[in-house]
Amino acid sequence: MSKLVIGLTGGIGSGKTTITNYFLALGVEIIDADIIAREVVAINSPALKAIAKHFGDDYIQADGQLNRPLLRNRIFSNKADKLWLNKLLHPLIRVNIVTQTKEAKSPYCILVAPLLIENNLLELVDRVLIVDVNESTQITRTLVRDSSSEQEIKAIIASQTSRAARVNVADDIINNDDSPLSEIKEAVLSLDKKYLTLTKMV
């Protein structure tokens, strides 16, 4: 069991995946909240059946998987539906996160959760690492990566915790605006040493 759980988060397009991969290369175990969220609605899962019963069979694709775009559009414009879905999925996701952090074998592990703050997961981690960028960087990167429009990206940014609020809960921050990859790697190496030192104090 890891002695320390680091919560890694940041807004859309902040570069969380890049940072995560650097830690992974150092042998740090990664718990990915997005992967867990997909697993709890796997084909024939109780949660997926509950979604089909509540929203209708249109929300299940021909191959038996969840129709994510359809559901995403539904809950983005309907607060009541979003609340219902969160009440269904969040407890399941939380249980899986706790299980995986307990099973982690590296001295410290990292929980990557884009909505670490929004979904009240802070109590599951010992420290918070924020990948920080300005909004223009978020928009530019996401436009390149996704098929979303600038308006859609801005709506997602507006729905997430503000940059200031994220920084306010941070124990550690990596600025990923215009820094060269060599500097980002150095920042990760420095934090790795710091976290390993902290595990010896637990």
From Swiss-Prot:
What are the protein's UniProt keywords? Answer: ATP-binding, Coenzyme A biosynthesis, Cytoplasm, Kinase, Nucleotide-binding, Transferase
Q: Give GO BP annotations, semicolon-separated.
A: coenzyme A biosynthetic process
Q: Where in the cell is it found?
A: Cytoplasm
Enzyme class, top EC level, equals transferase
UniProt GO cellular component terms: cytoplasm
Q: In which pathway does it act?
A: Cofactor biosynthesis; coenzyme A biosynthesis; CoA from (R)-pantothenate: step 5/5
Which cysteines pair up through disulfides? They are: none
Q: Which Gene3D superfamilies match?
A: P-loop containing nucleotide triphosphate hydrolases
Pfam families on file? CoaE
UniProt entry tagged with the keyword ATP-binding: yes
Spell out the InterPro entries in the cross-references: Depp_CoAkinase, P-loop_NTPase
Q: Which residues participate in ATP binding?
A: G13, S14, G15, K16, T17, T18
Q: Which domain of life is it from?
A: Bacteria
Question: Could you give a GO molecular-function term held by this entry?
Answer: ATP binding
The catalytic activity, as recorded, is: 3'-dephospho-CoA + ATP = ADP + CoA + H(+)
Reported EC number(s) for this entry are 2.7.1.24
Entry function: Catalyzes the phosphorylation of the 3'-hydroxyl group of dephosphocoenzyme A to form coenzyme A.
Among PANTHER family, the record links this protein to: BIFUNCTIONAL COENZYME A SYNTHASE-RELATED (PTHR10695:SF46), DEPHOSPHO-COA KINASE-RELATED (PTHR10695)
The similarity annotation says:
Belongs to the CoaE family.
The name this protein carries in UniProt is Dephospho-CoA kinase
Native source species: Colwellia psychrerythraea (strain 34H / ATCC BAA-681)
